[in-house]
Amino acid sequence: MYKISLLIFILTLIVPTYILGSYNYKNNNIKYSFPKSVLVSKKSDTYFFNDLGFRLFQGNCLIGNIYTTFPSNKSIQLIRKIEDKFINVDFGGEITTVKIREGFSNSNGSIILIDLGWKSIEDIKNFFDKKFKISLILKGGQGFDLNNYFDTNSNSWNIVGISKALDEATKLCNNL
């Protein structure tokens, strides 16, 4: 599952990446790859194709991209109609707008990659501080009906240990 999420994220950036190594740090998956970056992911509490991921790139290891995926039983042709569109979401109690980056074919339909934005690692850690679990609720599409594309509108992740995993990922990134 993680390899699929990694592949999806990499293809979204149109960057050829080859895994150089990986390990687990207290239930957090950490991988590093080429071009030089470090990935941290948390498995969903709810769905198989819904990891919450963080990617840090060499050269600016203090900023990370946050992303997730949602499964859909809709065809890839239909999902492609909402690529680069925006969704209003509730992420950890904060209302914000995120972007649908891309859709990918899956044996059961499609996988939708959602970009939750770029944040400093310290801001991410502060946002997750004292939380054991975080949820993402899709509120509404801008110019489209979510129900026509998404099978579910929410997901959650256990984020215990994520701050230490991000610290470890930052150290790895700085040593790339």
Residue ranges of each PLM-predicted region?
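A generic "folded-domain core" signal
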Residues: 17-176
